């Protein structure tokens, strides 16, 4: 018997959002790990908020929503609020009831800015990392480091002289034509009027220079999990500076290895890392003036060759951050804000990897 095409929707439902989400849905495991981290941030949240006044958006719900925005590549807060209106899965993950109103996008953004003022992203990342350590997913001996350029949300037309020298009036007020030919532009004489912290940089000689930041991650070599993240202004030494910063923050007193590409093959970096009880497994740059800083004491070891293979897994992290994690371009706001988003996106990647390692069924051959 053919069913009727009824258009009248029911007024009531006896099923909760919890019951509608499949037991094996990937977000179930991710939400469980996220909630565990948020419990540990309760005291820190109390420090950020006043005990009087109107209640804000709960920081726990705010962070869950921001996590969804990264995991599902929702390009703006306005679209995220739209999704929360009708997407049952999103409502369940954030913790909204079926009839609970969704926040106005501008209110959501204002509340998000409060979290940007604190080190919440760094603390959230540390909480996720501690779960991975408790599950014995992290190597405490072998690591890899690398950096990549994160294109800033600023156009070339915004890169103007710092001295404000006179320029001819624009031919079109909204989108003026700008001719850069014959003009020498550098970070010493110019800066972006859109994002003053962005720097003109290029990854290598064959690429065009863009306004960008330098995003750096340190991964452990067992499962390719991110153990530290650092975003700096893009300059000639940003990758090496970040590598030393992250090496200095590493826990434990035992000697460890850190693999890196040829760009890190300098006498200064190798010397400073060895002084931190770190054995650098840096790819040799024999074309460098003075030769490679790496000698046979390190390169003849079997572990050195293994590190050179393992370090390439770091590209998986950058690939995810620049596609799923919405970081092919950063958002305006300066190095602090962009660094906050970069660290939080690295934590999101970490949650996805942990879910795959801990909860994915093993395929039998």
Per-segment meaning from a language model:
Residues 2-5, 9-11, 15, 30-137, ...:
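Basic, low-complexity intrinsically disordered segments
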Residues 164-168, 178, 185, 262-336, ...:
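Helix-centered, glycine/charged polyanion-binding patches within enzymatic domains
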Residues 8-13, 41-45, 106-108, 194, ...:
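Short acidic (Asp/Glu) and glycine-rich catalytic loops that position anionic groups and cofactors
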